[in-house]
Amino acid sequence: MDKLQRDGKEDTSRQRRFLYLLLFQEDLYAIAYDHYFNRSSSFEPMENSSSNDRFSFLTVKRSISRIRQQNGSIIPFVNCDQNRLVGHSRSFYSELVLGGLTAVPEVPFSIRSKHSLEGMNEWTSFRSINSIFPLMEDKIPHSNFLLDIQIPHLTHPEILVRTFRRWIQDAPFLNLLRSVLHEHRNLTISSNLDQLILIASKENKRLSLFLWNYYAYECESLLVPLWKRFSHSRSLPYESFIERTPFYQKIKNIVIFYHKYIKKSLWFLKDPSIHYVKYRERSIIALRGTYLLVKKWRYHLTNFWQCHFHLWLQPYRIYIDEFSNNCFSLLGYLLSVKMKTSVVRIRMLDDSFITHLITKEFDPIAPTTLLIRSLAKERFCDISGHPISRLAWTGLTDDDILDRFDRIWRNIFHYHSGSSKKDGLYRMKYILRLPCAKTLACKHKSTIRVVRERFGSELFTKSFPKERESILLPFSKTRSQRERIWHSDIIQRNPLVNS
């Protein structure tokens, strides 16, 4: 594998033609074995791993050969030598082959991603899902329509094999992949992210995620030609000009002298704004244009996916939303665009006058109702928001109880610190403070008043040291209540938000 990575810098096509040979490398099955038992330590030498207490590498080789010779319904591990199994079921060897099938395609992808990330040694903020929101904060206010797309799920394993055929020229590897996917055909696609594609068991989650990511990459690759047609709209600066009509009139007056240059500049200003964001199974395209243009986009996307993957895409999977009327949910936020009116005094040579400047502002809001519903599901409060004590935690120490409630509050605040309104977050803090006091009161068989008098300011604020005050800017009295902060260390969605 090291040699393959070295050769990948010189000739990438070799990786696509000889992947099948890697399936017979013992190192891959050592990796698969270690992953099967969820071990994080270093791998043992292969001379020790080929014994009966580990696995029979020869049996796996024969299983792969048996797969290629099977016709019809393929059950490759039914005739394995049971004397060599030593207590392991046939699914154990199936997991080894699937582990090899997962590790082999990851080699070209890892080399490709390694080359693309050169020069970004310790910069990891690109993994943050909150990096989506600063982009949307700058771009979405200049769009008026949104296409909310749910990536269509595959219905047949042959479609996935066809997509792999575009970049893998190794026929034996494709045949083996086809056989394995057909074997697991009864485990079809689920909308659950833990059961993404074809293989739903926990042991095969790694292969499932790889297949899903590759399939999502293929879906996005269809949009590249369309993106190139609108390449002039990328990274355009947007400014709010006062008195835009006189501004354009002045440009028209200069057309006489600089006709070609001004024509190109005007074309840039009129160019449509198109922005694309994807997270897991959802894709969002923000457009600036008419409703007819948005309907054409939905029509073309539907036809592209149907022709490319030979599957039927339900129209409800591409939802059209208008910013001026509705808000949409993404990553635990309710996002909308609101109109903001500012009073501006314009001073001229002889006189001055007051005018109103109307601008669009990106408005992310933490969904208070959904957060309360999630807290109610975890039994911190009822559905209306009334606090409930956690009797299961009364056996813990006081510090552990305080730390657990503080940790929940920190996670909620840290994730939703980009909200434009903090009232909902203050309500979450109030809801969590009372269950904390009730839990301590039940433990000490006293009242909430006694608990508050005993702990004082330590109640619910024990894990907020002073050095964190510079980070918690939205709750500082000297800061605006509408200030938004997007933390770049968030790499997964808040588990308390189910939207």
Curated annotation (Swiss-Prot):
Any GO CC annotation of this UniProt entry: chloroplast
GO MF annotation: an example: RNA binding
Keywords on record: Chloroplast, mRNA processing, Plastid, RNA-binding, tRNA processing
GO BP field: mRNA processing; RNA splicing; tRNA processing
Main location, first listed in the record: plastid
Pfam families membership: Intron_maturas2 (PF01348), MatK_N (PF01824)
Cellular localization per UniProt: Plastid, Chloroplast
Recorded family membership: Belongs to the intron maturase 2 family. MatK subfamily.
HAMAP family, sorted: MatK
Name listed for the protein in its UniProt record: Maturase K
Designated gene of the protein: matK
